[in-house]
């Protein structure tokens, strides 16, 4: 760090603390905002402040929201009978971008009694008929799915999870063995 440039150094450090931003990129960003484009820098600072002040978890599903209920939970056009369980609000953003799902969500960022009770109340209140698990494939997620399925087996639900296998455009030699095994065992007829 350069002596006499404490504010610049603090900005570089703040950028470097963000995921996927290394020190060189942090320096480039700080320089760009302080020297090349101060207007963008002020706009960025304002947008960051507003996001921190106004974005919070949806009270029902845990998605990012500026209101008590997010746009998804408030949308009357959504399929209210299907609930997709995800690990984080970022997963909702990804699924929404894919435009492949039109139901509701529930963020299960941690498995505890409070979360399970909240999930159960949503299932009962909305008369959910299917839970879709869209969790990162791991032994822990398989255990979580099994646990929730066992806990809610008396609620007349259908349980499913998103398909896993080989990503498009990836050579077989580059696929991990678990994904390859899943792809073979859950193959579809053509």
From Swiss-Prot:
| Matches recorded under PROSITE patterns | RECR, TOPRIM
Give a yes or no for keyword DNA repair in this entry.
yes
Q: Which UniProt keywords apply?
A: DNA damage, DNA recombination, DNA repair, Metal-binding, Zinc, Zinc-finger
Q: Which Gene3D superfamilies match?
A: 3.40.1360.10, RecR Domain 1
Q: Which residues form the signal peptide?
A: none
- The answer to keyword Metal-binding applying to this record is yes
InterPro entries in the record: DNA_Rcmb_RecR, Rcmb_RecR, Rcmb_RecR_Znf, TOPRIM_dom, TOPRIM_RecR
One Gene Ontology term from the biological process aspect of the record = DNA repair
Specify the superkingdom: Bacteria
Domain Toprim: start-end pairs: 81-167
Q: Where are the zinc fingers (C4-type)?
A: 58-73
One GO MF term on file is: DNA binding
Recorded hits in Pfam families, A to Z, give: RecR_HhH, RecR_ZnF, Toprim_4
Q: Which HAMAP family match?
A: RecR
Question: In which family does this protein belong, per the annotation?
Answer: Belongs to the RecR family.
Q: What does this protein do?
A: May play a role in DNA repair. It seems to be involved in an RecBC-independent recombinational process of DNA repair. It may act with RecF and RecO.
Q: What is this protein called?
A: Recombination protein RecR
- Which species does the entry assign this protein to? Campylobacter jejuni subsp. jejuni serotype O:2 (strain ATCC 700819 / NCTC 11168)
